Design a protein with these regions (language model features):
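Aromatic- and glycine-rich beta-strand/loop motifs that create alpha-glucan
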Residues: 1-24
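Hydrophobic alpha-helical transmembrane segments of multi-pass membrane transport/permease proteins
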Residues: 18-46, 77-82, 188-193
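A structural motif at transmembrane helix-loop-helix junctions in multipass membrane proteins
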Residues: 19-22, 158-190, 196-206
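Secretory targeting signals
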Residues: 32-36, 59-73, 115-180
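Terminal transmembrane helical anchor/hairpin motif
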Residues: 38-65, 184-258, 263-265
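Long, hydrophobic alpha-helical segments
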Residues: 67-93, 128
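Transmembrane helix boundary and interhelical loop/hinge segments in multi-pass membrane proteins
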Residues: 84-104, 118
């Protein structure tokens, strides 16, 4: 109950701040631009296929593979750079405003505080996901995309967003500066989402260890990219769902440990 109260308060605070509207505006404009560009590219490919009478290729053309999957995949990458602005003040603002001590000395548990912050951020990314869902839904009016793949892609975007919110809560808990929290979250997300497998592959290649090694496979599991790719293709696996749940739990537990340590200082 305390967690929901904190979540409601934080979510209202987010939507009062101009940062939320800047993020949502940028998110909507970028999404609209990417979707329109993808749609134009798809129409041009279809016209070329019709021009050369490549009927088999036209029949095999899939809206999900050619349009929806690349669109949601692109927005996942954009998320890495916008989400830190949403999460940077979730905990650090309490420290900067001097209200952290009030929270720590209240009967509210540390876990309620962490969970409340996380739920507030999750509520915000739900709105972001709903904005993205609007664009693929338009295709159902004029075409026949696969509903299962479309829903899987949107659920994937929501799950990875919630995982990144947990990362942001952790980064925000280690500092009183929102700027530092922003930078730290950005670095962690870029590493987790994009750079980690690449850096490990380079390191292992230099040491003569193959990509099939245990280390490489472990890093591939830790990085979000492989899990996102599978779900965008409509392949929903319990291992991928477990990954998002475990990753979120780990960063929330780390956040709890950091905040709890402040109580005993």
């Amino acid at each position: 109950m305390h967690a929901l109260t904190i979540a409601g308060r934080e979510l209202r605070a987010l939507f009062i701040s101009p940062v939320a509207y800047v993020v949502l505006t940028l998110w909507s404009v970028i999404a609209g631009t990417f979707f329109l560009a993808s749609l134009i590219g798809f129409q041009e490919r279809m016209m070329q296929l019709q021009q050369f009478q490549m009927l088999q290729q036209i029949q095999e053309t899939n809206l999900n593979d050619q349009l929806i999957e690349p669109f949601i995949g692109s927005m996942w990458v954009i998320l890495l750079f916008l989400l830190p602005a949403v999460t940077m003040g979730l905990v650090s603002s309490e420290k900067a405003n001097g209200t952290e001590e009030l929270l720590l000395t209240s009967p509210i548990s540390i876990w309620d505080i962490v969970l409340g912050k996380f739920l507030a951020g999750s509520g915000f990314v739900f709105v972001m996901t709903a904005i993205i869902a609007f664009f693929p839904m338009l295709l159902f009016v004029y075409g026949e995309p696969e509903l299962g793949k479309t829903v899987s892609g949107l659920v994937c975007l929501l799950l990875v967003s919630m995982t990144y919110v947990a990362v942001g809560v952790f980064a925000s808990s280690v500092t009183r500066s929102q700027l530092i929290a922003f930078v730290l979250t950005l670095v962690l997300l870029v590493m987790l989402g994009l750079m980690l497998p690449f850096l490990v592959d380079i390191t292992l290649a230099g040491s003569g260890v193959g990509r099939d090694s245990g280390i490489s496979q472990a890093v591939q599991w830790i990085a979000t990219g492989s899990h996102v790719d599978r779900m965008l293709r409509g392949l929903v696996d319990t291992a991928d769902l477990a990954y998002f749940a475990i990753s979120s739990a780990v960063f929330l537990l780390l956040s709890k440990a950091v905040i709890e340590s402040a109580r005993w200082r």
